[in-house]
């Protein structure tokens, strides 16, 4: 079972439906016991960093102890960072060293919304069957700054920013696989296969 952690954000139905489409059994939950027993965990997207991290901190001992694959989507990926500057400066989970910052005005329209391409920067099982140049769907005003060693894909929006990161059992995407058509479903299927191992 894959636990989709409910920390008060939107988009829970679309990610659970997409995972079910690729054969996963899912449970949307904030119950620490269910999360502890899951074979994979998803931190979904769409919401504010501050309120999400406050809710996660209530079950921090449980999520810090997880050794199963964890997928962070959009806000979920940003929560992996050391800190975020969204609405102030807030400590993140610090699973992937980095800082979440707002796009500079020089990029043009913020939020970055719509389809954009991936540039794969290193091999990663989560991206099996996905090629550079394929389109995925974004909705965000903030992005993670992190070392290249953790970056598996980048995307250009006036600046090159990390659109995919990976460290140990933590995998994060700034885009929404559940809204990214066949490419997104392939990525979610890869995650399910990683979880099954």
Curated annotation (Swiss-Prot):
The keyword Hydrolase applies. Its main location: cytoplasm. Residues 1-197 form the Glutamine amidotransferase type-1 domain. GO terms for biological process: L-histidine biosynthetic process. Keywords: Amino-acid biosynthesis, Cytoplasm, Glutamine amidotransferase, Histidine biosynthesis, Hydrolase, Lyase. The keyword Transmembrane does not apply. Pathway: Amino-acid biosynthesis; L-histidine biosynthesis; L-histidine from 5-phospho-alpha-D-ribose 1-diphosphate: step 5/9. It catalyses: 5-[(5-phospho-1-deoxy-D-ribulos-1-ylimino)methylamino]-1-(5-phospho-beta-D-ribosyl)imidazole-4-carboxamide + L-glutamine = D-erythro-1-(imidazol-4-yl)glycerol 3-phosphate + 5-amino-1-(5-phospho-beta-D-ribosyl)imidazole-4-carboxamide + L-glutamate + H(+); L-glutamine + H2O = L-glutamate + NH4(+). Gene3D superfamilies: 3.40.50.880. Its EC number is 4.3.2.10, 3.5.1.2. It is found in: Cytoplasm. It comes from the Archaea. The active site is at 74 (nucleophile), 176, 178. One of its GO terms (cellular component) is cytoplasm. CDD domains: GATase1_IGP_Synthase. GO terms for molecular function: glutaminase activity; imidazoleglycerol-phosphate synthase activity; lyase activity. IGPS catalyzes the conversion of PRFAR and glutamine to IGP, AICAR and glutamate. The HisH subunit catalyzes the hydrolysis of glutamine to glutamate and ammonia as part of the synthesis of IGP and AICAR. The resulting ammonia molecule is channeled to the active site of HisF. Heterodimer of HisH and HisF. HAMAP family: HisH. This is Imidazole glycerol phosphate synthase subunit HisH. It comes from Archaeoglobus fulgidus (strain ATCC 49558 / DSM 4304 / JCM 9628 / NBRC 100126 / VC-16). The lineage of its organism: Archaea, Methanobacteriati, Methanobacteriota, Archaeoglobi, Archaeoglobales. The gene is hisH.
């Amino acid at each position: 079972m894959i636990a989709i952690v409910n920390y008060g954000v939107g988009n829970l139905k679309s990610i659970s439906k997409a995972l079910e489409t690729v054969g996963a059994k899912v449970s949307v939950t904030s119950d620490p016991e269910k999360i502890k027993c899951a074979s994979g965990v998803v931190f979904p997207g769409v919401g504010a960093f501050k309120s999400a991290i406050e809710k996660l901190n209530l079950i921090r001992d449980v999520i810090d102890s997880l050794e199963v694959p964890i997928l962070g989507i959009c806000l979920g990926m940003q929560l992996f960072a050391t800190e975020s500057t969204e609405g102030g400066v807030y400590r993140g989970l610090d699973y992937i060293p980095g800082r979440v910052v707002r796009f500079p005005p020089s990029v043009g329209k913020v939020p970055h919304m719509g389809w954009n391409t991936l540039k794969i920067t290193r091999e990663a099982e989560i991206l099996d069957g996905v090629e550079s140049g394929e389109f995925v769907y974004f909705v965000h005003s903030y992005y993670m700054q992190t070392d290249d060693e953790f970056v598996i894909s980048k995307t250009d929006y006036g600046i090159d920013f990390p659109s995919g990161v990976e460290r140990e059992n933590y995998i994060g995407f700034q885009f929404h696989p559940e809204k990214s058509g066949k490419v997104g479903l392939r990525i979610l299927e890869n995650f399910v296969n990683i979880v099954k191992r």
